[in-house]
Amino acid sequence: MGDKTDVVIVGGGVIGFAVAYELARRRVPVLLIDKDLPGRATSASAGGLWPVGEAVGLGCGVIYQATQAAARKQAGLDPLEVEESHDGILPAAFRDLLVASNALYPDLSSELLETCGVDIEFRLGGGLIFAVYDEAERKYVERVTAALPDSCRLEQLTPEETWRIEPMLTRELIGAALLAGEHQVNPMLTAEAFKRAAIVHGARFRHDTRVTGLRRQGDRILGVEIGDEFVAAGTVINAAGAWTGELAATAGLSVPVFPVRGQIVLSQALPRTLNACLSTSGCYIAQKLHGEVLIGSTTERVGFDVSVTPEGVSGLCKGAVRAVPLLQHVGIKRVWAGLRPGTEDELPILGPVPGIEGYINASGAFRTGIVAAPLIARLVAQSTVGEAYDMPIEPFLVERFGEHALATAGPS
C-alpha cells in the first residue's frame, strides 16, 4: 500500500488543475497525479474564450465545416447543402455550458490572482470575427444566425464594416460575422494558476508520475496503480485528456475519447495589429498580449503522434496570409502540436458511470477545454461531493454512447 486520499485526479491539464482547485476550495483532500506527457491539450490551445463561436462552428470548428463542404464539392454535391448532422452547430446544452463558463472568467481571473499571484492575462477582446470568403460560407453564417437565440448576439457585417474594425483584413472577403463577448486568456498561465491556487487550498500533486492503471473490485474503483505502488482513493477522477480512454480501459470501462492533433504556429511579436480574434475556413488568428500572433489549428486523427508537419504548418500559414496579408512578412517564432481529447459528438464526457462507484469522468472537451474549464470543474466537483449541479449534467454523461461501462468484466 502506498498513499491514500479522498480523491485522486489523474491528469494535469487545465481541466485536472481546475477540478483540483474546486475540490480543494471545498476542503476535500485531493491528490493530482500527472505525467506531463508531450502534447497535452492545453498546449494546443489559443487561449481564445469563444463560447458561442465554438458552439456554432465559427471558431476553429469552422475548419471542420470547410472540410465537409470541400468533400461534398469533390463528390459532385452542392457544398451549400450541408447536412444537419454534419454541420458545426452543437447542441444548445453545450452552448449554454460554454457561455456560462465564459461568464465566470472576469471574477475568476481576479480570484486566482489574489489567491496565488498568477495573472492569467484575461483580456476583454473585440469579439470574434469570422471572415466570409464565398457564398457557401455566407449561407452557413445565415444558418448559424437563425439557430442562435436572441441572447447570443451575432452581427453580420459588410466588407466595409469589417475593415473599419479590422483594417488589416484581406480585401478578398465578401462579408463577416461578429460575435461579441469573445475574449482571451493565456492557456498555460490559466492552467498554472488553477494548479497553484489548488495548492494554496491544500491540494497535493505528484509530478512526473504515470498512473499505469485503475484498480477495480467488482463495481467499485478502489484507486490507482503507479507501477508496483497502489494509491487508494474514495473517488478517482479521470482527467487524462487524450489518454482518458486508455486509462478507463485498464478497469474494463469504455470511455470513447480519442486524440486529435492540433498544430499551432506562433509569429514573432508585432505592434498591435488586430483588434479582435479572427476565424476563417483556413485557420484562426489571435494576437496575444505581448504581440505574437498565434495561428491554429489543424484537426487531425493521427493517434498520439505530436509531430509538426510541413503540410500542417504550410496550410495554417497560407490561411493566415490570405486573411491578413501583412503576415507574409512576419517571422515564425515557434511551431508545435498538441493532442486534444475528442469525442464523436464533440461534447465533453463528465460525471459518473452508471453501476460503477468511486469513478468520475472529466474529459473530452476537445477544442473548448480552456473556456469550459471553470464550469466543468464545478460540475465535476459537485458530482464528487454530492452537491446540486449548477446546470444539468445529463447531456454530458457517458451513457449517451450506449454500451459504455462494462467493456470487459472487472476484477472481482
Give short role names for the model-derived ranges.
Residues T5-L31:
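N-terminal Rossmann-like FAD-binding beta1-loop-alpha1 element of flavoenzymes
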Residues V324-S412:
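C-terminal catalytic lobe of FAD-dependent flavoproteins
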Residues L90-P91, V118-D134, Y140-H201, T298-V302, ...:
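Helix-loop-beta segment of a Rossmann-like dinucleotide-binding subdomain
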Residues A176-T235, W243:
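Helical element adjacent to the flavin cofactor pocket in flavoenzyme catalytic cores
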